[in-house]
Amino acid sequence: MAKKIIGFIKLQIPAGKANPSPPVGPALGQRGLNIMEFCKAFNAQTQALEPGLPIPVVITAFADKSFTFVLKTPPATVLIKKAAKIDKGSSKPHTDKVGKITRAQAEDIAKTKMPDLTAADLDAAVRTIAGSARSMGITVEGV
């Protein structure tokens, strides 16, 4: 018989930098989960990724105090800002443009994000990424 699920916890944690301090400690502690066990497992799975890149994670907590977790792809906005080499998007996105990315960069981001996007193919995923970039005040060349 399957274990009884008592809840899901959604967090964004920098790759390789999970530690018991907030937000990880309080979120897991409320459900009675082993915080250090999660931190070690998360850091082990994300050590191949760029350190500090925020990684969304969904933790499934079970009634017997065990857990499983699923890593998602980094947020599109973080990848877009990194590609455009900017710190933050525009405060007036459709008026003030703060950077540019090429279609090739948008395709790379779309390939990275593909498992988490609902797009049917790569072209649709590129258009999704281009829309996110435009809403941040970043021009996408060739789309």
UniProtKB/Swiss-Prot annotation:
Top-level taxon: Bacteria
Gene3D superfamilies the UniProt entry points to: Ribosomal protein L11, C-terminal domain, Ribosomal protein L11/L12, N-terminal domain
SMART domains found in the cross-reference section: RL11 (SM00649)
GO terms (BP aspect): translation
Gene Ontology cellular-component annotations: cytosolic large ribosomal subunit
UniProt keyword annotations, A-Z: Methylation, Ribonucleoprotein, Ribosomal protein, RNA-binding, rRNA-binding
Annotated SUPFAM superfamilies: Ribosomal L11/L12e N-terminal domain (SSF54747), Ribosomal protein L11, C-terminal domain (SSF46906)
Pfam families linked: Ribosomal_L11, Ribosomal_L11_N
GO MF assignments: large ribosomal subunit rRNA binding; structural constituent of ribosome
Post-translational modification: One or more lysine residues are methylated.
InterPro entries noted in UniProt: Ribosomal_uL11, Ribosomal_uL11_bac-typ, Ribosomal_uL11_C, Ribosomal_uL11_C_sf, Ribosomal_uL11_CS, Ribosomal_uL11_N, Ribosomal_uL11_N_sf
Family: Belongs to the universal ribosomal protein uL11 family.
Biological function: Forms part of the ribosomal stalk which helps the ribosome interact with GTP-bound translation factors.
NCBIfam families: L11_bact
PANTHER family (alphabetical): 60S RIBOSOMAL PROTEIN L12, LARGE RIBOSOMAL SUBUNIT PROTEIN UL11M
Oligomer and partners: Part of the ribosomal stalk of the 50S ribosomal subunit. Interacts with L10 and the large rRNA to form the base of the stalk. L10 forms an elongated spine to which L12 dimers bind in a sequential fashion forming a multimeric L10(L12)X complex.
Protein name: Large ribosomal subunit protein uL11
Originating organism: Paraburkholderia xenovorans (strain LB400)
Gene name per UniProt: rplK
